[in-house]
């Protein structure tokens, strides 16, 4: 496994980040522990979760359970593992029935951090990420709460998730004025089929020195070789079948290119991300040990300039005309 700095920090993380959104939901605790064991053995030292993970992932989710954090916490208790990993979690989502049980008020940040530490059975979080932007809370309040956690040793670094480019700029401007390090990483939806962040978020990350952690690198499985795989699980749903038909011409060209390269579609999709200098580590979310093992090979794949150009032709970037394409 190769390692790189997380953004402009001195912290070294693996080129793949293990996402645990499925832990406690579609993946039971025993399998989750096996995935964590296999990841650590393979050299993955970057593990990402969130307080809300472990609940059934659906658009109408009402309240998080913290189950994913609890599973990781019980795994960490088995000795010697905490010192070998970089542990990241998130704050923002609804975690209780009260009016202050969500978002990024100082009240909720303090309580959410304490709850995450308890569930994770650790005394500190390495990277504490804001899961979404909160337009109801001033940045001065957010940073004051985060600075206190850092001063107390409960958090080492702060990251963001699903931020727009101008949100990153605003956050960093306020942090700089307070003589605070500010954001060190951003998690964004980014893959060959979803390249909108190339307009503003990636330039913002490059400018401010944030590491980029792309989530959904395989577009929910769409880039995993769906045309030649038997439909199962999420791929068997009618909505996913319609998505395949919508992208069938591109998928046929893409999977044909991967076959010519002698690489799997999922490995090519991950390798494409890894060759972007702003990308720190794609966020992989294996549901099984076998899926994790398949993803590891991607770190050894190098795509030629011609292949990168072919991928751009199949899956074009956002493009556009000013000011939309040059808003940063």
What are these regions (language model features)?
Residues 11-16, 43-45, 81-85, 122-126, ...:
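Short, well-ordered coil/turn segments that N-cap beta-strands
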Residues 53-59, 94-100, 291:
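A short acidic, helix-capping loop that chelates divalent metal ions and anchors anionic groups
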Residues 1-84, 151:
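N-terminal binding-site loop/beta-alpha segment at the start of enzyme catalytic domains
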Residues 196-233, 264:
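Aromatic-lined glycan-binding groove of carbohydrate-active enzymes
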Residues 93-193, 200:
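Glycine/proline-rich, positively charged
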Residues 207, 231-256, 260-261, 275-279, ...:
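Terminal-tail/helix-coil boundary detector
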């Amino acid at each position: 496994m190769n390692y790189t700095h997380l953004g402009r920090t001195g912290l070294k993380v693996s080129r793949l980040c293990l996402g645990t959104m499925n832990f406690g939901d579609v993946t039971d605790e025993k399998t989750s522990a096996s995935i964590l064991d296999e990841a650590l053995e393979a050299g993955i030292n970057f593990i990402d979760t969130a307080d809300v993970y472990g609940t059934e992932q659906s658009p109408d989710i009402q309240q998080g359970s913290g189950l994913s954090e609890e599973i990781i916490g019980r795994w960490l208790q088995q000795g010697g593992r905490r010192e070998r990993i970089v542990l990241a979690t998130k704050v923002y989502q609804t975690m209780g029935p009260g009016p202050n049980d969500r978002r990024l008020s100082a009240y909720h940040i303090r309580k959410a951090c304490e709850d995450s530490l308890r569930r994770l059975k650790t005394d500190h979080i390495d990277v504490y990420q804001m899961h979404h932007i909160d337009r109801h809370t001033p940045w001065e309040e957010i940073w004051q709460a985060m600075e206190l956690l850092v001063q107390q040793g409960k958090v080492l670094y702060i990251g963001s998730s699903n931020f727009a480019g101008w949100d990153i700029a605003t956050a960093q401007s306020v942090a700089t004025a307070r003589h605070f390090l500010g954001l060190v990483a951003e998690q964004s939806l980014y893959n060959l089929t979803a390249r909108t962040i190339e307009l503003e978020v990636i330039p913002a990350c490059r400018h401010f020195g944030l590491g980029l952690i792309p989530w959904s690198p395989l577009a929910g499985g769409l880039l995993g070789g769906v045309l030649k795989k038997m439909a199962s699980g999420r791929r068997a749903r009618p909505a996913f079948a319609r998505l395949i038909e919508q992208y069938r011409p591109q998928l046929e060209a893409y999977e044909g290119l991967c076959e010519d390269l002698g690489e799997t579609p999922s490995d090519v999709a991950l390798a494409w991300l890894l060759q972007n200098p702003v990308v720190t580590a794609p966020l992989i979310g294996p549901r099984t040990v076998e899926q994790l093992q398949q993803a590891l090979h991607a770190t050894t794949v190098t795509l030629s300039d011609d292949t990168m150009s072919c991928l751009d032709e199949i899956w074009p970037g956002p493009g556009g005309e000013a000011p939309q394409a040059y808003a940063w």
